[in-house]
A protein has these predicted regions:
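A sequence-level detector of short linear motifs
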Residues: 15-18, 50, 177
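A short coil-to-beta-strand element that immediately follows conserved catalytic motifs
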Residues: 92-102
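Acidic, metal-coordinating catalytic segment for phosphate/diphosphate chemistry
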Residues: 1-44
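Nudix hydrolase/Nudix homology domain
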Residues: 102-178
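Conserved Nudix-box catalytic region and its N-terminal flanking loop in Nudix hydrolases
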Residues: 23-35, 44-88
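Residues that flank catalytic or metal-binding motifs in active/ligand-binding sites
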Residues: 4, 32-34, 68, 100, ...
Length: 178
C-alpha cells in the first residue's frame, strides 16, 4: 500500500510541511480532515446519518462515526474531500451541494497515537434511500439514521439509548436491516 502523505500545520493553522500519516499520528502534527454529516428530513422529522466503521480499521475500529470522514492528502484541497463520500458511501455529491459548518480542532491521545485534526466540517441534506448507498467494505460496515433530537439527547447523556434504522453488512456482503 502506498504511504499517505498529509499536510502538517502549526497551532496557528499555518502549513509547515508534509509528513506520512504514520508520522503525523506518532508525533502529533496538526493535519486536515474532511467530515460530512448526512442529514435528511422525512415527514417533518430530522435525521442524522452515522456509519459503522469497519472492525478492521486501524484508527477507531468498530465505532459509529460521521458519514463520511477522512484525511485530506497533501496534494488535495478541501474541495477534494467529496471523494470520501464517493469512496465510502458510493454517492456522487458535488462540493456545491455541501453546507460549510466550519473548521473544528480535535485532539485525542492514546498510547502511541496522537490525533490532532483540523476538521473541515460540512452538512449534506440527503434525499437518498438506503438502497442508493454502496458501502466500501474496508472502511464502512453499516449505515444508520437516528432522529436528530434523540441523537442530541444521547450526546448530552439525557438518554443512554436511541432507536436507529438502517443496515449492517454481514460477512457475505449482504445487508442486514435493523
Amino acid at each position: 500500500m502506498e504511504t499517505e502523505l498529509l499536510k502538517v500545520f502549526d497551532s496557528n493553522r499555518i502549513q509547515t510541511g508534509v509528513a506520512s500519516r504514520e508520522e503525523v499520528h506518532r508525533l502529533g502534527h496538526w493535519h486536515e480532515v474532511f467530515h460530512c454529516w448526512f442529514a435528511s428530513s422525512e415527514a417533518g422529522v430530522d435525521y442524522l446519518y452515522l456509519q459503522h466503521r469497519c472492525a478492521m480499521k486501524k484508527d477507531y475500529p468498530n465505532l459509529w462515526d460521521i458519514t463520511p470522514a477522512g484525511h485530506l492528502l497533501a496534494h488535495e484541497t478541501v474541495y477534494d474531500g467529496v471523494r470520501e463520500i464517493k469512496e465510502e458511501l458510493g454517492i456522487d455529491v458535488s462540493f456545491d451541494e455541501l453546507v460549510p459548518l466550519g473548521i473544528i480542532e480535535y485532539h485525542q491521545t492514546k498510547e502511541g497515537f496522537i490525533d490532532k485534526e483540523l476538521a473541515n466540517v460540512f452538512l449534506y441534506e440527503s434525499a437518498h434511500s438506503f438502497d442508493d448507498f454502496t458501502l466500501q467494505p474496508e472502511e464502512v460496515s453499516g449505515l444508520v439514521k437516528v432522529v436528530l433530537t434523540d441523537f442530541e439527547e444521547l450526546w448530552t447523556e439525557a438518554k443512554d439509548k436511541v432507536y436507529i434504522k438502517g443496515f449492517e453488512m454481514n460477512h457475505e456482503g449482504r445487508r442486514m436491516m435493523n
